[in-house]
Amino acid sequence: KLSGAAATLVANGDVEAALGVDMNGATRRTAALAGVDFLKPTYGTVSRYGVISCAASGEQVGVYAKDAEKVAEIMGVIAGHDDKDGTSLKDEAYDYAITDVKGKKVAINKYLLDKADDATKAKVLAFADSLRANGVEVVEVSCDMAEIANTAWQILMCAETCNNISRYDGVKFGHRAKEYKNIDELYVNTRTEGFNFLTKAVILYGSDVLSKTRYKDCFDKSLRVRRVVAEGLQKAFENFDAILTPACSKSEYEAYDIKDAFGKVFEESVFTAVPNLIGIPALVTNGVQLMGNHFSEATLLSLANSVEKEGK
């Protein structure tokens, strides 16, 4: 069954909070399955210094906790400018204060809702009902932009990861193969031993989309899709304070062979790719996901808190 160590530790009460790097939504999926909160903040608000970089243009350090109040508390400590991180925004601090949500407007993405199983749909609809009870206007919309966003992000993520982890060659740092006869064998044996099947698949696909024959049709086009998606979401956030979606398609997953992982991850990432692609914040709470405009973390946390208070 799919689980995450950090999410499990928080769920079990072993720690009050934990940090995780959200690159492709895995942190949000494991939080949803474990029943804890996870906030992927606006890109550049939390330092990535010290993180092993894979997909640098979309990965972001976020916070696991049992409730929105604790997430807000931790974010108030870790967010802010860091000279050691070239992607860090210049703001020294951000506002994560939880406020009243009466009058806020939230959209449910019915397109993504229909892709989830019945148990997950029930969680989303129950969350929406709780928001309405707290004075939030909730309406249904249908938008398939998540599909092209997912495809674009998988291309960009694989390309960036391929480039970034090329440094792991057994020479300067990381794993080093013990048996080799020349430098080429050192590279091959080190990477064969050190990378699992999924990582190797990402490297191969990333290398392909960066090739001379595929760069323009794949990588370059994905960058253009990123801009189109960003513009489309900006228009949506002119009318809504947040978008409510499932965080994943199921409430529980059975184990599957690692060789099927690449396809499985692609299928699930349709729910989580948009925030990574365009850098907006996303909060998983009560097994559902809230997405907001850049720097709208306080709104997302407030919406989550209004529902969480009912369950206490």
What kind of feature is each model-predicted range?
Residues 23-27, 33, 112, 144, ...:
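Acidic, glycine-rich active-site loops and adjacent beta-strand->loop/helix elements
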Residues 28-33, 50-51, 119-121, 150-153, ...:
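Short acidic, glycine/serine/threonine-rich loops at helix termini
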Residues 84-89, 135-144, 234:
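Flexible, glycine/charged-enriched surface loops at secondary-structure junctions
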Residues 16, 78, 125, 130, ...:
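Glycine-rich, small-residue loops and helix-cap segments
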Residues 40-122, 127, 185, 189, ...:
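A short helix-breaking turn/cap at a secondary-structure junction
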Residues 25-28, 115-117, 148-149, 211-212, ...:
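Flexible loop/turn segments at secondary-structure boundaries
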Residues 1-78, 278-286:
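Short glycine/serine-rich loop segments
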Residues 133-153, 286:
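Short connector loops at secondary-structure junctions
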